[in-house]
């Protein structure tokens, strides 16, 4: 989230933002601003930068881990990009009740991929948790997972996880709006666990790991592993899911926080990226944009490939329904792949629910 404005404007704006965040955090630290304690255990997964850290795949992994233990998790998200306001029930743990335009693309993806999880969107995480307590009083979830909540200090958490993208030079970064930092790096001291994501395993990984270890917080490392390629001939038809076949010539498109990581993942699977189109994170697609992508793919005999998040975003846009009926497109499923610290993560997650 950096802005294309002169440095003479951005630098003072970043300094002002930094001071506002510093004052706000100090008010919480001194308990002038009060933190609410939920009767249900809370796990927060957030970041210290604006988008593209690999947070959503980690949220998905944690939800699936709790489900594998026989737990009933609830996911609380802001629902970025949604056209609704207030507290909304996305899934009751049995049925997904909303499309992505009403709850946000990432939230819709999490709900559909974890049908047994309760999913709520709300601007204020506390409002969402109190809604869960009232709405599911007779069958409470075992744990609530706050998506993107590191900066939301109004609600206390039992475990605070911060995800950091190795590819972002955070230790030389500026605050929003000049840079991508949401708050100063010193505030990583609030976290219980740091996850260094999208690692390459080279000298960059080692250097950033050393920097993070200076915080005194445990650090685990994870790359992004490609799953299957889901291809649809007409995006409302039954999906065909299969392993990625090397040699596919693709037109890749995405509207995510870190699109180059998507390209790197595709190329790592042997997919040849002949052309690509990037859009802003959470940007709505239009019929004109989709038609242009299809025309280019047809002319160059390329396969349209996008992210799972973009797929769900398109499905939720009413104005795209007609063109999507005939659009052939594939999306790549991804997951975190831990290279160091998976056992520690599970131990800390278990402790939250007294396992």
Swiss-Prot record:
Alphabetically sorted, this entry's keywords are: ATP-binding, Kinase, Lipid A biosynthesis, Lipid biosynthesis, Lipid metabolism, Nucleotide-binding, Transferase
The GO annotation for biological process reads: lipid A biosynthetic process; lipopolysaccharide core region biosynthetic process
Q: In the record, what terms sit under GO molecular function?
A: ATP binding; tetraacyldisaccharide 4'-kinase activity
Instruction: Tell me its EC number(s), please.
Output: 2.7.1.130
Instruction: State the pathway, as annotated in the record.
Output: Glycolipid biosynthesis; lipid IV(A) biosynthesis; lipid IV(A) from (3R)-3-hydroxytetradecanoyl-[acyl-carrier-protein] and UDP-N-acetyl-alpha-D-glucosamine: step 6/6
Top-rank lineage group of the source organism: Bacteria
Q: What Pfam families is this protein classified in?
A: LpxK
User: Where, by residue number, does ATP bind?
Assistant: 49-56
* GO-annotated cellular components: plasma membrane
Enzymatic reactions: a lipid A disaccharide + ATP = a lipid IVA + ADP + H(+)
Q: What is this protein for, i.e. what is its function? A: Transfers the gamma-phosphate of ATP to the 4'-position of a tetraacyldisaccharide 1-phosphate intermediate (termed DS-1-P) to form tetraacyldisaccharide 1,4'-bis-phosphate (lipid IVA).
Under HAMAP family, the record lists: LpxK (MF_00409)
Q: Which PANTHER family match?
A: TETRAACYLDISACCHARIDE 4'-KINASE, TETRAACYLDISACCHARIDE 4'-KINASE, MITOCHONDRIAL-RELATED
Q: Which family does it belong to?
A: Belongs to the LpxK family.
| Protein name as it appears in the record | Tetraacyldisaccharide 4'-kinase
């Amino acid at each position: 989230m950096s802005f294309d404005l002169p440095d003479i404007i951005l630098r003072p704006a970043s300094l002002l933002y930094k001071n506002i965040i510093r004052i706000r955090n100090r008010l919480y630290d001194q308990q002038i601003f009060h933190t609410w304690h939920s009767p249900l255990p809370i796990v927060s997964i957030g970041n210290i930068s604006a988008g593209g850290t690999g947070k959503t795949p980690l949220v998905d992994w944690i939800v699936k881990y709790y489900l594998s233990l026989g737990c009933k998790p609830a996911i609380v998200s802001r629902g970025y990009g949604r056209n609704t306001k207030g507290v909304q029930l996305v899934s009751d743990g049995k049925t997904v009740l909303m499309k992505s335009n009403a709850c946000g693309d990432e939230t819709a993806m999490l709900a559909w991929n974890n049908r047994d999880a309760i999913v709520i969107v709300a601007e204020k995480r506390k409002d969402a948790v109190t809604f869960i307590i009232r709405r599911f009083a007779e069958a409470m979830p075992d744990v609530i997972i706050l998506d993107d909540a590191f900066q939301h200090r109004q609600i206390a958490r039992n475990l605070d996880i911060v995800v950091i993208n190795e590819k972002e030079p955070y230790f030389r970064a500026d605050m929003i709006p000049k840079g991508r930092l949401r708050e100063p790096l010193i505030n990583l001291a609030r976290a219980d666990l740091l996850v260094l994501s999208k690692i390459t395993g080279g000298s960059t990984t080692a250097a950033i790991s050393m920097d993070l270890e200076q915080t005194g917080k445990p650090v685990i490392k994870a790359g992004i592993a490609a799953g299957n390629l889901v291809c649809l001939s007409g995006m409302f038809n039954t999906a065909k899911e299969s392993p990625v076949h090397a040699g596919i010539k693709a037109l890749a498109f995405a509207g995510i926080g870190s699109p180059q990581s998507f390209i790197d993942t595709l190329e790592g699977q042997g997919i040849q990226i002949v052309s690509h189109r990037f859009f802003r994170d959470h940007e709505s697609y239009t019929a004109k944009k989709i038609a242009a992508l299809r025309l280019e793919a047809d002319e160059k005999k390329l396969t349209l490939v996008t992210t799972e998040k973009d797929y769900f975003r398109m499905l939720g846009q009413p104005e795209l329904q007609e063109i999507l009926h005939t659009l052939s497109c594939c999306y790549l499923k991804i997951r975190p792949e831990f290279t160091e610290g998976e056992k520690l993560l599970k131990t800390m997650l278990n402790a939250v629910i007294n396992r």
